[in-house]
Amino acid sequence: MIAACMVIPVNLIGTFRLGELLVLALYPFYMKQILKALRNREVMAIVGLGLLWLTSQVLSDLYNATTMKNSLRGLGSIFLTMTTFLFFCGLYCRNPRNHLGTLLGASAGGVLSAGLLYRFEGNNAGYAENIWDFYVSGWAHPAFAIFAFLFYRSHPWLVFPLGIAYGIVANMYGGRSDGLVVLISTLFFVYLWFQVTHSRGDLRYSMRSGLMICAVLLVPLFLLYVVYAQSGALGKAAKMQIDLAKNPYNPVEVLLLARNESVIALDAIYEKPILGHGSWANPGHLRRLYLLKMREIYGAAAPKKLIQDILPVHSVLLGAWVFGGLAGFIFWVYVIYRTFYLSNQLLINGSMGMIAIAVVYVPYFCWHVLFSPNAFARFSWPMSMAFLIFANAFFMRPNAAPKR
């Protein structure tokens, strides 16, 4: 229910989601489980860094004389991220398999979101050009995680073609990042299957070696992407980005063209690296600099003005640093590190179903923390991170005996 309601906006001081309001309403009923979850060292470390991030945001807002409205929006975003995380920790501390219900809810929410967008924004040209991102990925990605959980152990050859098809179709219909993370997960699934069948189930070094192999295999996939993007088969946006690249075979240049907001984020961080610019910062000189850089890249096709009321950063990691200072950056670097660590521990100790969900999450987490806006941090990350923590805690019990 909560995961499904995360797509329904409620406008108060800022934009809440109905799911967040339900979390706050249910807190008293789950307080006992939440307090129990706080005994977990992983939870305490994340909460401690979250409090440090919140404190840094308060200091940043005071230093930058941020308006009360914007300060409440920025502080509220951090507060809701952490309270939602703690709620799901309480929900999963007894049984991490409860996460399957959350995934079902997230998939249902994706269907609901697609229906609402089509009903009220069906004529929006931007949505039509990016069908996958706006109408499909919201329900398809959690559905893929559920499918992997159910079938990877017993029928892995069903998971492989589905993941490859997902990646190809997503790229064809504008979901390049979503297709990429699922292709990486699928490559890892193939590697993991060979490891399980040829190493008697010993997966101790599989995370490190698997990621290295995936990185190598991504090279020919990137070359194929360039060829098809240049031909126009992957849509206008992909073709324009490839055509603008001085060297289309340079993946860093192509990535920066797709996520050009990172450039202005680095300028903003350079100006105020310790405390940042404050909640919902929107400095006029940085906006003008961003538009100037866009004209240098896109020429006449560059935007003439910015309609957002916040500096366009498009990165959870860099955004936390730009608006809240260095402590926000440290928080999300720690999250990425623990995601790899906890996923690796699941590979060693967990059941194959739980491992499958972790494999889906690793590239998903990394991509969205690095290259997606703050919505990921508030609406998707809390439930997923809580799952990784308590799936590990479940299989680390003395009497736990995972069935591969």
Model-derived regions: residue spans:
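Transmembrane signal-anchor hairpin modules in multi-pass inner-membrane enzymes, especially those
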Residues: 1-62, 67, 93-98, 149-158, ...
